[in-house]
Amino acid sequence: MATSAPLRSLEEEVTCSICLDYLRDPVTIDCGHVFCRSCTTDVRPISGSRPVCPLCKKPFKKENIRPVWQLASLVENIERLKVDKGRQPGEVTREQQDAKLCERHREKLHYYCEDDGKLLCVMCRESREHRPHTAVLMEKAAQPHREKILNHLSTLRRDRDKIQGFQAKGEADILAALKKLQDQRQYIVAEFEQGHQFLREREEHLLEQLAKLEQELTEGREKFKSRGVGELARLALVISELEGKAQQPAAELMQDTRDFLNRYPRKKFWVGKPIARVVKKKTGEFSDKLLSLQRGLREFQGKLLRDLEYKTVSVTLDPQSASGYLQLSEDWKCVTYTSLYKSAYLHPQQFDCEPGVLGSKGFTWGKVYWEVEVEREGWSEDEEEGDEEEEGEEEEEEEEAGYGDGYDDWETDEDEESLGDEEEEEEEEEEEVLESCMVGVARDSVKRKGDLSLRPEDGVWALRLSSSGIWANTSPEAELFPALRPRRVGIALDYEGGTVTFTNAESQELIYTFTATFTRRLVPFLWLKWPGTRLLLRP
């Protein structure tokens, strides 16, 4: 729509002579001409130090520049009128959409009163109420707040970027962990399948060997039976003929007695062994293989269960709790017994009468495992001697199983002497009971002064080892009979499960298990009154 002549005339009146656009924030200079505020700042002095008016060339002072509020309002109204002329009926103006209007004068808000903290239009700014106040352009007043908002926004954006980066890294870590778990799952399945395959192959191999032995025994049995039946038949025929000959009259018997006896010379009849020596040897070797299999599987099961269920921990001894009868190594992992009390100063945490010592590390949860090595000359030799005795007994049993030979057991003078010395041996065993050691766990609050029983009711769960045997330190003591004397005692503590399990760390044989409800901190416990013996914590 074409602009009308009156409106065009008004537009010319409110047009800046410098920028040829509507007067923006109009101001008047000393000569009375009106320009945009921003245009006056761009005016440069032609001669001298004062700028001159672009129209009349008269100099003016910038400090004398004054705003023309009414003209600014007129410019707004012209712009609004121009827009409204092209607006459809009922359509909301852009100013009404984008800007708030003064509630009093319905004019656009341009200024901000710093004294009252209110937004002002041109009319409000020139009113008696706000004229003495400091009023600045709304954009200028908003600039510091906008900068604060932008600074805060920048901080928030950095925080957002950090969170997004943290989330991305966390997601990547989780995905990597899940991938690792999947790989470990496949590894577990593959390893167990390989183990199953190996065990199946070994099982089939052993069963094949067993089947061959069964076949050899069965064939030997048939030969043994057949040979025995043949010998019995031959003997029956001879017996029958001799019985008939014995019933003959004397005259008939004496006619050919010599010839008859010569036909049946006296000979040894066959007495064979039911099992061939080679087969018997193979059977014994197979029994040894089964023992090795049993021992190997037991060690494997014990080690696997220990490694998967329990955490192996490295423990040390607490020197402040060590009795004066004990001597600790520099690394606090080895203890020896001395018959002389060496402690000059009795620490409050020290055992005074009992030769005991506690571990420096305690446990209040979880499943943990450590070992105690018993180092003593001859500690493992008794076991080997026992094996030799068992082998000798087996040889004697084989000799007794022979055919046609036998022997009687006669008591010797040495046996009588040994029977007479039983009382002396019993007295020596009673003395050996005093020379022993204990390994186990104890509450960190266990009593340490005076003579102690060191039993579960006192907060100690331990085994007692000596050259004469092994006992669980219960009330009363329970003697134990493990297959092998342990050179290393494994101690497995399940705090929540309430168990302390002792095993032979080398053969994985279960020795004893204490059950209890633990409520206090538990620490390793050693007790040693055995000259020539050392206890070492492993690892």
From Swiss-Prot:
Catalyzed reactions per annotation: S-ubiquitinyl-[E2 ubiquitin-conjugating enzyme]-L-cysteine + [acceptor protein]-L-lysine = [E2 ubiquitin-conjugating enzyme]-L-cysteine + N(6)-ubiquitinyl-[acceptor protein]-L-lysine
Q: Which residues form a coiled coil?
A: 188-227
Q: Does the keyword Chaperone apply?
A: no
BP-aspect Gene Ontology terms: host-mediated suppression of symbiont invasion; innate immune response; positive regulation of DNA-binding transcription factor activity; positive regulation of non-canonical NF-kappaB signal transduction; proteasome-mediated ubiquitin-dependent protein catabolic process; protein K11-linked ubiquitination; suppression of viral release by host
One Gene Ontology cellular component annotation held by this UniProt entry: nucleus
Q: What is its main location?
A: cytoplasm
Instruction: Please name the GO terms that the record assigns under molecular function.
Output: ubiquitin protein ligase activity; zinc ion binding
Stimuli inducing this protein = By cytokine TGF-beta and binding of activated SMAD3 to the TRIM26 promoter. Upon herpes simplex virus type 2/HHV-2 infection. By type I interferon.
Q: Which residues form the B30.2/SPRY domain?
A: 295-539
* Ranges annotated as B box-type zinc finger: 97-138
- Keyword annotations from UniProtKB, A to Z: Coiled coil, Cytoplasm, Immunity, Innate immunity, Metal-binding, Nucleus, Transferase, Ubl conjugation, Zinc, Zinc-finger
- Gene3D superfamilies with a match to the protein in the record: 2.60.120.920, Classic Zinc Finger, Zinc/RING finger domain, C3HC4 (zinc finger)
Q: What class of enzyme is it?
A: transferase
Q: Which SMART domains match?
A: BBOX (SM00336), PRY (SM00589), RING (SM00184), SPRY (SM00449)
Zinc finger map (RING-type): 16-57
Q: What is its EC number?
A: 2.3.2.27
What function does the entry list? E3 ubiquitin-protein ligase which regulates the IFN-beta production and antiviral response downstream of various DNA-encoded pattern-recognition receptors (PRRs). Also plays a central role in determining the response to different forms of oxidative stress by controlling levels of DNA glycosylases NEIL1, NEIL3 and NTH1 that are involved in repair of damaged DNA. Promotes nuclear IRF3 ubiquitination and proteasomal degradation. Bridges together TBK1 and NEMO during the innate response to viral infection leading to the activation of TBK1.
Please give the family membership noted in the entry: Belongs to the TRIM/RBCC family.
Quaternary structure note:
Interacts with TBK1; this interaction bridges together TBK1 and NEMO in order to activate TBK1. Interacts with INCA1.
Stated name of the protein: Tripartite motif-containing protein 26
